[in-house]
Amino acid sequence: MKKTPLKIGFDLDGVLLYNPARIFRPVTIVAKSILRQKKQTKTEFYYPKTEFEKILWNIVHWSSLYIADGYDEIIKLSDNKNIQSYIITSRYDCLKKDFERWLEKMHADTVFTAAFHNKNNLQPHVFKAQKIKELGLDFFVEDNWDIVQHINNNTHAKGLWISNAFDKSIPYNEKFMSLKEAMAFIKQTIDRD
């Protein structure tokens, strides 16, 4: 009997694309807490409003340097119909052109069932949770710990976390240091079922 393919979503920056800047997450958390006038009571992410901020936001995303090691395993599992894969990036609409450039570079149309960017500029965790529910995903591979927690608490999908050197001490079972490690876990899950 043919197995139903696992439905898996992938974040773009820091997951499908290697992004060394993600190691600065702890630094940005400390800076935000110092600069913030009031205590943060919920998950919220910065949104660039002015044209200048949007230009800076584009420059910041240039830190996604190349396709991450492990991408070839997504291609194999997709080609073999073991997974239905989706790109769900919280990149705001001001980054649409760069998103499309990466889709072309990755030949995403031949690998992924669909690719979505945050064209309505929702808060990233809200956008991703909505798409995950809409698509009925089994897993979502994400490098932001706050978003992983939000996914686990607000969807039926299991968040697979690509951690970093500073956050690796946070206890979590489905924690990996690279896309390649996360894909090995997914392959084991498929082979086990």
What do the predicted segments below correspond to?
Residues 59-87, 93-101:
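Short, acidic loop-to-helix structural element flanking the phosphoryl-transfer center
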Residues 117-118, 173-185:
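Short acidic-hydrophobic, aromatic-tinged amphipathic segments that line or gate anion-handling sites
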Residues 137-177:
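Acidic, Mg2+-coordinating phosphoryl-transfer loop and its flanking beta/alpha structural elements
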Residues 91-92, 144:
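Helix N-cap/beta->alpha junction signal
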Residues 1-58:
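Active-site neighborhood of HAD-like aspartate-dependent phosphohydrolases
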Residues 93-139:
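Substrate-recognition "cap/lid" segment bordering the active-site pocket of phosphatases
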Residues 19, 88, 162-164:
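Generic beta-sheet signal
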Residues 17-20, 25, 94-98, 148-150, ...:
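Short catalytic/ligand-binding loop motif for oxyanion handling, primarily in non-cytosolic enzymes
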